Swiss-Prot record:
Membrane topology: Multi-pass membrane protein
Source organism of this protein record: Schizosaccharomyces pombe (strain 972 / ATCC 24843)
Family annotation (InterPro entries): GPI_mannosylTrfase
EC number: 2.4.1.-
Signal peptide: none
GO molecular function terms attached to this record: alpha-1,2-mannosyltransferase activity
Protein name as annotated: GPI mannosyltransferase 3
Residue stretches spanning the membrane: 180-200, 229-249, 257-277, 285-305, 330-350, 358-378
One Pfam assignment: Glyco_transf_22
Amino acid sequence: MRIWFWLAILVFRWWNALWVKTFFQPDEFYQSLEVAHHFIFRYGFLTWEWTSAIRSALHPLIFAALYRVLQVLKLDSSYFVFTNAPKLLQGTFAAILDYGTYKFALVRYGSKTANWTLACSLVSIMNAYVGVRTFSNSLETTLTSIGFYYFSYYLKYENSSPEQRKKAYSSLLGFISVAAFACFIRPTNILVWIFPLLFWNKNPQTPIKDLLSFSNVFNRFRFLYALGYGRLFGIFVLCVSLFLVNIIADRILYGRFVFPIISFFQFNVTSGLSSLYGLNAWHYYLSQALPLICGGFLPFVLLTMDLQTAGTILCVFFPYSLIGHKELRFVYPISPILLTLAGKFFSSFSSWKRAARFFFLIGLGHALVITFLCRFHQFGVMEVMPLIHSLAEKNQTGLILAPCHTTPWQSHIHSPFAENGWKFLTCEPFEKPFDETDRFYENMPTFLDKIKEWPDYLIFFEERFYSLYSYLDSRGLKYEEVQRYYNSLIPESRERAGALLVYKKL
């Protein structure tokens, strides 16, 4: 495809990223932008994961570099530029995800399937709603799509003539690079590659007896040995360089030598502490995550599912299902291979018009869901941020009485005054006996009685209105409503019901 076409997709994803006006999950900010902001500007809120060195520095340092550029150019003083620049960068990563998914399908299934796969990627609910957000999972998915492309290109020349092994070798180096970075950012990304590395070959329709045979695995490693023989030094240098980059990145952010992958494994696997963030049914990834990732393409994905893709999904879903805490975005990196199956289904139609009709109906349904999620669901908690920014700039104090991390923080306030002048309820997992959020909702009067100096502004959800109004009145505190923001038709929890209210002290 011509370069202008890919530039158009880049512009589309930029628009997509800027068009999103809603909140999804706190990690979009507190595991990326907030960390980057703290690193560059030396103020902001660091969650326990960063004070305990449980996460890789690679992802937030990307946005830290962007913030540094804005700082040097003195563009960070513009609230519009400061809050939208990260969106444009993430939109670029989302466009690369579209490109990587297309290239993977092109090598794996051919041009017709690749064209349909790209179309599916462009109307994917997950790509439009999650892919343009600054989650580490989003960048992980982008890297995974490129990794699948390089690995499929490698398979194409596996067992080839000596003259063509140079192509296989260069593809292998590309695969090692992007897969390593994906695993550094999210160590669990290794699950995506277990089955492909052992069993995939260039023919997706290989029978199960041949696919899982010992000879298939033996031939894979025999070719890798033949390919690497005489080139081991180059592979060794690449691997060492990648590890050094990761170690140096962690050293830069944390200020000391740390190994986040060890802490990450201990917290999420051996300790079981991840369950503090909620428990899900063992079948969550099959019964909920898979349908949500595929959307309207789910029946077609299941109809065209081959053994190599099914094995890959199983190797991802099974280990994740053993952990009590589950989230949709954890398995987002498998979306490129699922979208290629949807593209394969549409390419199987003998009539292009019939395939286009099917696609149009599904795309229309996806567009409605995307519009609801990106423009209406959890809208108010983002819409209030410019107001908080302007109040902090005027040295007005405030307190957000809502579940922890309901809003972004300094990545959307960007005010040194707010560091002490504004507060929100925390929920660090090691707070005893309960975290601030629990204490507030368990016994609101007792919690509020400990406030020595009441702030200029209170922000809370409508569900808290009557109890909070009664408390303020009983204490002789006078506040009046100055703003209310619609938040969601379907609240994420009882504590988030109703509009988001802003009250000013009289």
